[in-house]
Amino acid sequence: MARHGGGRGWYGKVVGAALGVTMLAVGASVWTAQADSVGGGPASEASASAAPGGAAEAVDVSIAHASDAGPRGVNITIDDGPDPAWTPQVLDLLDEYGAKATFCMTGVQAEAHPDLVKDVVAAGHRLCDHSVSHDTGMDKKSEAYQSKEILDAERMIIKASGGVRPMYYRAPGGAFTPYSRKLAASHGMRPLGWNVDTKDFERPGTNAIVATVQRELANGPTILFHDAGGDRTQTVEALRQVLPWLKEQGYAFGFPVR
């Protein structure tokens, strides 16, 4: 869970379709990231989230931050699970407040808890590949290693879900490389960043997690939480406050653009 600064506020632009790689410009995380949307609204994307099996269509290699729900959209993203102690509680809260989320699962956890993966899919949420082992040093490893971590996790998640593909790839700790982004995109998984790192994995207290969301939401729409990797009581309680607050502020729950 270290190195979380790596995926925050990266707004990549594709430069050279023939090469299929991008140059990353590290800039301020702002709502103008909505301009990075590569087509498709909530209706068209919702149907894609449940598409089982088959070959995946390639997607944009740039790191997504924007929401398909428009300028007042927010993306709830949940990392490192699923976990039987916490994922069901998170799912219950999302259902209570009519929120959708993107679950970035490790292959190990998905393989261990296929019932929870299926529960996530059945509730209308989206799946995201978070590598097999959550190695935050992946960007320093060989391309063969990166490929194995990403593609093995993809297979494990698809099997656990009963055939539903992950729609995104989030590098552990934001440890993306041009190679990993291109590989993921070629398998239909849009590289996924974040704008608000709640740092809930540090267990700073429920109030601190909530305050971080309220303070940093102006940075952009994609909010990072965790449902595994330790005691997530504070995360659950923070979501219990954050989800209704977002609705009261007029935000709509969406998914990251693809």
Question: For each of these PLM feature ranges, what is it?
Answer:
Residues 1-20:
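N-terminal export and membrane-targeting signals
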Residues 81-88, 111, 144-147, 174, ...:
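Soluble non-cytosolic domains of exported or imported proteins
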Residues 175-216, 250-258:
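His/Asp/Glu-enriched short active-site or ligand-binding loop at hydrolase and phosphoryl-transfer sites
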